Amino acid sequence: MQDAITSVINAADVQGKYLDDSSVEKLRGYFQTGELRVRAAATIAANAATIIKESVAKSLLYSDITRPGGNMYTTRRYAACIRDLDYYLRYATYGMLAGDPSILEERVLNGLKETYNSLGVPIGATIQAILAMKEVTISLVGPDAGKEMGLYFDYICSGLS
């Protein structure tokens, strides 16, 4: 996992250069949004169960996926879906705090699509639930933090597509 600071420094180091104006601006932007990201992470942590519950209600609860024969029909499958959504929310929050999506690639997306396909997990419904989670999260953290957080939800959706 990297963060925005490490990414900028590593890029300069690989080239054997000092930080240029563009790199300094990236760091400045990261530091200027630090308090916003920390407040958003605290809000998400305090409301994680509600975010998951509302996301499921918006996207999955009343669809064919929860009816008999659907992919979330048994309690065990439903619990696995809730667990996965919580996992996505947590790691998207970590990525937002770090200002870098690399943790999503390393800990979430690496092999996930293949695993879901082999288990018959409907990727379209998963993406729909993640997008609902993005919407619910934005409504809680506000538009500025929501825009930042949305980048990481979109990154997960893109990786699953």
From Swiss-Prot:
Instruction: Give membrane topology per the record.
Output: Peripheral membrane protein
Q: Where in the cell is it found?
A: Plastid, Chloroplast thylakoid membrane
Q: Name one Pfam family in it.
A: Phycobilisome
Q: Per UniProt, where does (2R,3E)-phycocyanobilin bind?
A: T66, N71, R76, C81, I82, R83, D84
Organism encoding this protein: Pyropia yezoensis
GO annotation, biological process: photosynthesis
| CDD domains cross-referenced by the UniProt entry | APC_beta
Please list the disulfide bridges: none
Q: Which UniProt keywords apply?
A: Antenna complex, Bile pigment, Chloroplast, Chromophore, Electron transport, Membrane, Methylation, Photosynthesis, Phycobilisome, Plastid, Thylakoid, Transport
Q: Does the keyword Chloroplast apply?
A: yes
Can you tell me which family this protein belongs to?
Answer: Belongs to the phycobiliprotein family.
Q: Subunit notes for this chain?
A: Heterododecamer of 6 alpha and 6 beta chains. The basic functional unit of phycobiliproteins is a ring-shaped hexamer formed from two back-to-back trimers contacting via the alpha chain subunits. The trimers are composed of alpha/beta subunit heterodimers arranged around a three-fold axis of symmetry. The phycoerythrins also contain a gamma subunit which is located in the center of the hexamer.
Its biological purpose is as follows: Light-harvesting photosynthetic tetrapyrrole chromophore-protein from the phycobiliprotein complex.
Q: What is its main location?
A: plastid
Gene Ontology terms: cellular component: chloroplast thylakoid membrane; phycobilisome
Has UniProt tagged this entry with the keyword Ribosomal protein? no
Q: What is this protein called?
A: Allophycocyanin beta chain
Q: Which PANTHER family match?
A: ALLOPHYCOCYANIN BETA CHAIN, PHYCOBILISOME 32.1 KDA LINKER POLYPEPTIDE, PHYCOCYANIN-ASSOCIATED, ROD 2-RELATED
Q: Which Gene3D superfamilies match?
A: Phycocyanins
The further comment given in this record reads: The light-harvesting antenna system in red algae and cyanobacteria is formed of phycobilisomes. These are composed of the phycobiliproteins phycoerythrin (CPE), phycocyanin (CPC) and allophycocyanin (APC). Cyanobacteria also contain phycoerythrocyanin (PCC). The phycobiliproteins all share the same subunit composition and organization with variations in the covalently bound open-chain tetrapyrrole chromophores.
Q: Which residues carry this modification: N4-methylasparagine?
A: N71
Alphabetical list of InterPro entries matching this protein: Allophycocyanin_b (IPR006245), Globin-like_sf (IPR009050), Phycobilisome_asu/bsu (IPR012128), Phycobilisome_asu/bsu_sf (IPR038719)
Q: How is the protein modified post-translationally, according to the record?
A: Contains one covalently linked phycocyanobilin chromophore.
